[in-house]
């Protein structure tokens, strides 16, 4: 289950990276001049809204969240399969959960691969 959560975070990161809207308003585009009310007698004061964060910052935030989620899921998967004193099982009786998809880990989430080592 935790592996699926990590994969979902990775897919979310990839979607945020590659699906940035190319037609998004940038720079000085959009409605200006008369369409904003200058010709209708509006005051000449410029009202600035809150600063908007760019796509690069959103992608970086998504990358940090995906790396943290994947690292936590990997750590939890390891903790569940390792030998503990009180559970009465030998370390050879349980196969680690990350072996079955360990080949995909380095290219799906490089940060999780770094945390893996």
From Swiss-Prot:
Glycan-bearing residues: 87
Keywords of the record: Amyloid, Cell membrane, Glycoprotein, GPI-anchor, Lipoprotein, Membrane, Prion, Signal
One of the record's GO molecular function terms: nucleic acid binding
Signal sequence bounds: 1-24
CC terms in the record's Gene Ontology section: nucleus; plasma membrane; side of membrane
InterPro entries in alphabetical order: Shadoo
Lipidation (GPI-anchor amidated alanine): 104
Keyword tRNA-binding: no
Pfam families: Shadoo
Locations listed in the record: Cell membrane
Topology with respect to the bilayer: Lipid-anchor; GPI-anchor
GO BP annotation list: protein import into nucleus
Propeptide: 105-117
Top-level taxon of origin: Eukaryota
UniProt keyword annotation of Nucleotidyltransferase present: no
Known role: Prion-like protein that has PrP(C)-like neuroprotective activity.
Family statement: Belongs to the SPRN family.
Protein name (database record): Shadow of prion protein
Name of the gene: SPRN
């Amino acid at each position: 289950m935790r592996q699926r959560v990590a994969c979902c975070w990775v897919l979310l990161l990839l979607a945020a990276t590659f699906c940035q809207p190319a037609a998004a308003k940038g720079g000085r585009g959009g409605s200006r001049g008369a369409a904003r009310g200058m010709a209708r007698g509006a005051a000449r004061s410029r009202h600035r809204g809150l600063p908007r964060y760019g796509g690069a910052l959103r992608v970086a935030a998504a990358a940090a969240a995906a790396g943290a989620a994947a690292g936590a899921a990997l750590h939890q998967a390891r903790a569940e399969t390792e030998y503990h004193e009180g559970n009465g099982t030998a370390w050879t009786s349980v196969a680690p959960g990350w072996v079955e998809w360990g080949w995909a880990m380095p290219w799906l989430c490089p940060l999780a691969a770094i945390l893996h080592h």
